[in-house]
Amino acid sequence: MTWVLFDYGGVICEPQSEADRARLARASGGPAADFEASYWRYRLDYDRAALDVTAYWQRVAADLGRSYSDPEIAELSRLDSTSWLTLQPGTVELITGLAAAGHRLAVLSNAPADVAEAVHALPVAGYFEHLVFSCALKSAKPDPECFQATLALLRAEPADVIFLDDRRDNVAAAAVLGMVSFQFTEAPAARADLARHGIAAG
């Protein structure tokens, strides 16, 4: 049976809003542009659990000439997780329709443990048989190992998986392994892409 494998950030949830990024920058105590650069500089290592929450935020702090207290790290982590929880209504509608039609659904997302925990608590998480996060795999997209570990969890061959992700490099990496892959732009286009492969939402 075919699996529909969704990315989370930028697909199920909205990208971080300007307001959320501004709140994070203010909490960081540094200039917004410098904070933004440092936030992403170490993100992949944070996503794949090479850095824990304290090590990640202290790396960011060091770039800004600061050192964060435990309460400051807790607040930054809270703001960070919250910034990834605004769902895209069209995608949620697509997910509920696919689930109602009996399709098997899973998530593969690059995310640190705090964000993954927050996503698991969302009602939409209940539609997925598996929620797979890079922090648990200790490997992140677009690394082939990340996809291969996910296929093993799904007990699926690449040809049995349709993958949707907003990042072109992740889509390309999945395609190399043999998955049917689409770059996500908006829910109606994703619905049409899936329908062309015989996956219709109820």
What are these model-derived regions, one by one?
Residues Q16, S81, N110, D114-A118:
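Short, charged helix-to-loop "capping" segments that act as catalytic/coupling loops
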Residues S81-T86, S109-N110, S139:
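Short, flexible loop segments at the rims of nucleotide/cofactor-binding pockets, characterized by
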Residues H103-R104:
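Conserved, well-ordered alpha-helix/loop/beta-strand core segments that scaffold catalytic motifs
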Residues M1-T2, T96-A99, P112-G202:
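Asp-based, Mg2+/Mn2+-dependent phosphohydrolase catalytic module
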Residues M1-E93, A100:
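N-terminal helical cap/lid subdomain that shapes the substrate entry/recognition surface
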Residues D7-G10, A49, L98, V107, ...:
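Generic structural signal for small/hydrophobic residues in well-ordered secondary structure
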Residues E14, V107-S109, Q183:
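Hydrophobic residues in well-ordered beta-strands that form the structural core
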